[in-house]
Structures are given as C-alpha cells and as structure tokens.
Amino acid sequence: MHPEIEARQQHRILQKEYGSFYRAVSDIIFRHNPIDLDGKRNTGEYDPEIDALLSRIQEAENLDTLHELLFEVFRTDFGEENCGDRQRYEAAASEIWKAYERHRAM
C-alpha cells in the first residue's frame, strides 16, 4: 500500500479510536505551536505528529515519559535543529497528560 494512503487510514483509525481526546490533543498542540507554524486556525498541520504520539501513547506511564515521547515525535519529524529544546514541550505535555488521564477514566 502507498505510504500516503496508509497514513491517511491510520489517521482516520486514530481519530475514531480516540474521538474527543484526539481533538483535545490537536487543540493543545496547535495552541502551544512548538514549531511556530504560521496559522490562525487549526487546520491539522500537526496531525502527523499527533498520529505518531497517539499510536504510542500507551507507552507513557507518567507525565515524564509522555513529555519524552512528545519531544521524540517532534525531534523525529522536524529534526534536532528545528524542534527546539525539550523544555519547549513541557506545558503541552502536561495538558495532554491531564486530558489522557480523563480519557482513560471514561
């Protein structure tokens, strides 16, 4: 299967599986905008990173491991020179962790 088609299918699966939690993570990442993408509206520019994060989020045992996972996803997708330092992702990771705890409690 073509990688782009596979990525779109995976995106739809994750959106369906996580529902409102997916939207919450998307809003959090868009609001914190760690790569300083130029956008006034959340048009899904960070969707590949959100997909990568959510496909592995069950590995996160606590806030620290989620923070490391989030940083790793952005470092992989944008490169060491573009992603900034780990601290840049701390506030977003904290908000995502709180949303994840609410999601797991449902």
Which role does the model predict for each range below?
Residues 1-106:
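Charged, amphipathic alpha-helical regulatory modules used
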